[in-house]
Swiss-Prot record:
The keyword Metal-binding applies. It comes from the Bacteria. Keywords: Iron, Metal-binding. This is Iron-sulfur cluster assembly protein CyaY. The gene is cyaY. GO terms for cellular component: cytoplasm. GO terms for biological process: intracellular iron ion homeostasis; iron-sulfur cluster assembly. The keyword Ligase does not apply. HAMAP family: CyaY. It comes from Rickettsia akari (strain Hartford). Belongs to the frataxin family.
Length: 101
């Protein structure tokens, strides 16, 4: 994947995460703040940071629950080195259904 493709897919993914939270978080318990390539999610569990790392062609997640993790794009999914998917981790930790992507 070239840099342009990575950037487009990563931007779509971060926008999807943002939009999904805003649609499903009816109680507004998650404060969503997107600044450029960095998405901050302030929750009752702590602050999540999700950002794209163009040089590595990865999305990085810093979670107050599961810690830091890097995800690469493979077969239409963002996966970490042990095969866990970004959307599955976010679904479990935030109680928001991200599995429609």
């Amino acid at each position: 994947m070239n840099n342009t493709e990575f950037s487009k897919i990563a931007d779509i993914t971060i926008a999807y995460i943002t939009d999904t939270i805003e649609e499903q978080d009816k109680e507004a318990s998650i404060d969503v703040d997107l600044q450029g390539d960095i998405l901050n999610l302030d929750t009752d569990k702590g602050i999540y940071v999700i950002n794209k790392q163009s040089a590595a062609k990865e999305i990085w997640l810093s979670s107050p629950v599961s810690g830091p993790c890097h995800f690469f794009y493979e077969q239409g999914k963002w996966k970490n080195r042990v095969g866990l998917e970004l959307m599955a981790i976010l679904t479990e930790e935030l109680d928001i259904d991200f599995n429609n992507v």
